[in-house]
From Swiss-Prot:
PANTHER family: CYTOCHROME C OXIDASE SUBUNIT 3, CYTOCHROME C OXIDASE SUBUNIT III. Pfam families: COX3. GO terms for cellular component: mitochondrial inner membrane; mitochondrion; respiratory chain complex IV. It is a multi-pass membrane protein. The keyword Transmembrane helix applies. PROSITE patterns: COX3. The chain crosses the membrane at residues 16-34, 41-66, 73-105, 129-152, 156-183, 191-223, 233-256. Residues 35-40, 106-128, 184-190, 257-261 are mitochondrial intermembrane. It comes from Felis catus. Belongs to the cytochrome c oxidase subunit 3 family. Component of the cytochrome c oxidase, the last enzyme in the mitochondrial electron transport chain which drives oxidative phosphorylation. The respiratory chain contains 3 multisubunit complexes succinate dehydrogenase (complex II, CII), ubiquinol-cytochrome c oxidoreductase (cytochrome b-c1 complex, complex III, CIII) and cytochrome c oxidase (complex IV, CIV), that cooperate to transfer electrons derived from NADH and succinate to molecular oxygen, creating an electrochemical gradient over the inner membrane that drives transmembrane transport and the ATP synthase. This is Cytochrome c oxidase subunit 3.
Length: 261
C-alpha cells in the first residue's frame, strides 16, 4: 500500500462479506421458521449477526475513508457508480411487486369474484393513515435536502438538526406502518391481495428501516466531525437512498392504497 503509484483503493482481505452472507442466510431461514413454526430463535440469531457485521464493516470503511485517506476522488467516483447501480437494481426489485399487483388487479379472475379488491377483502382507507404516511415521508425528503444544503454550506448545527428531524420522521413512519398492519382486517395469507399488499409495503418498510439506520450512522459521524463540505459521499449515498424510498412510497400509495382500493 505504501508503494502504490495509482489512486485506486486496494482493499485488504475482509471477513465481512462472508459473515454478511451467512447472516442473510440465517435471516431468510429464520423468517421461514417463524412463518411456519412460530420459532424466532434463528431469525433473532440472523438479525444479531447481521447487525454485528454492519457495525464492523461500517467501522472499517470509516477508518479507510476518514482516517487513512483511501477514498480519493477516483475511488469516490467508483462508489457513486456503485450506489447508482444499486438503486437501479432496487427499482427492478420493486417493479416485480408492482407487476404482480397490476397483473392480478387489472384482470381479476373468477376465483377473486371477478372484482378488485377481491370479494371479502376490506381495503384500508387511503385518506387516513396512508395519507399521513405520505406527508411524513415527503416532509422527510424536504428535511434531508435541508441537511444536504447545510452540509454544503458548512452549517454544522443546521445539518444535525435537519438530519435528526429526518431520522425522527423515518421512525414515526415505521411506527405508523406497524400500527396500520396491526389494524388491517386481512393478512398476508388472504389470497393475492394480501400477499401483494404485504410484500410490497413490507419490503418498502424494511427499506425505510435500512435508510433510517444509514442516516443514524451519518448523524453519529457528523457529531464526530467526519464530514466536510467537499468530502461526504457517505451522507450523499444515504440521501439518494432516502429519496428513492420516498419515490417508491408515492407509487405504492397511488397504486395499492388509492387506485387499488
Amino acid at each position: 500500500m505504501t508503494h502504490q503509484t495509482h489512486a485506486y483503493h486496494m482493499v485488504n482481505p475482509s471477513p465481512w462479506p462472508l459473515t454478511g452472507a451467512l447472516s442473510a442466510l440465517l435471516m431468510t431461514s429464520g423468517l421461514a421458521m417463524w412463518f411456519h413454526y412460530n420459532l424466532t430463535l434463528l431469525l433473532t440469531l440472523g438479525m444479531t449477526t447481521n447487525l454485528l457485521t454492519m457495525y464492523q464493516w461500517w467501522r472499517d470503511i470509516i477508518r479507510e475513508s476518514t482516517f487513512q485517506g483511501h477514498h480519493t476522488p477516483i475511488v469516490q467516483k467508483g462508489l457513486r457508480y456503485g450506489m447508482i447501480l444499486f438503486i437501479i437494481s432496487e427499482v427492478f426489485f420493486f417493479a416485480g411487486f408492482f407487476w404482480a399487483f397490476y397483473h392480478s388487479s387489472l384482470a381479476p379472475t373468477p376465483e377473486l369474484g371477478g372484482c378488485w379488491p377481491p370479494t371479502g377483502i376490506i381495503p384500508l382507507n387511503p385518506l387516513e393513515v396512508p395519507l399521513l404516511n405520505t406527508s411524513v415521508l415527503l416532509a422527510s425528503g424536504v428535511s434531508i435536502t435541508w441537511a444536504h444544503h447545510s452540509l454544503m454550506e458548512g452549517n454544522r448545527k443546521h445539518m444535525l438538526q435537519a438530519l435528526f428531524i429526518t431520522i425522527s420522521l423515518g421512525v414515526y413512519f415505521t411506527l405508523l406502518q406497524a400500527s396500520e398492519y396491526y389494524e388491517t382486517s386481512f393478512t398476508i395469507s388472504d389470497g393475492v391481495y394480501g400477499s401483494t399488499f404485504f410484500m410490497a409495503t413490507g419490503f418498502h418498510g424494511l427499506h425505510v428501516i435500512i435508510g433510517s439506520t444509514f442516516l443514524i450512522v451519518c448523524f453519529l459521524r457528523q457529531l464526530k466531525y467526519h464530514f466536510t463540505s467537499n468530502h461526504h459521499f457517505g451522507f450523499e449515498a444515504a440521501a439518494w437512498y432516502w429519496h428513492f424510498v420516498d419515490v417508491v412510497w408515492l407509487f405504492l400509495y397511488v397504486s395499492i392504497y388509492w387506485w387499488g382500493s
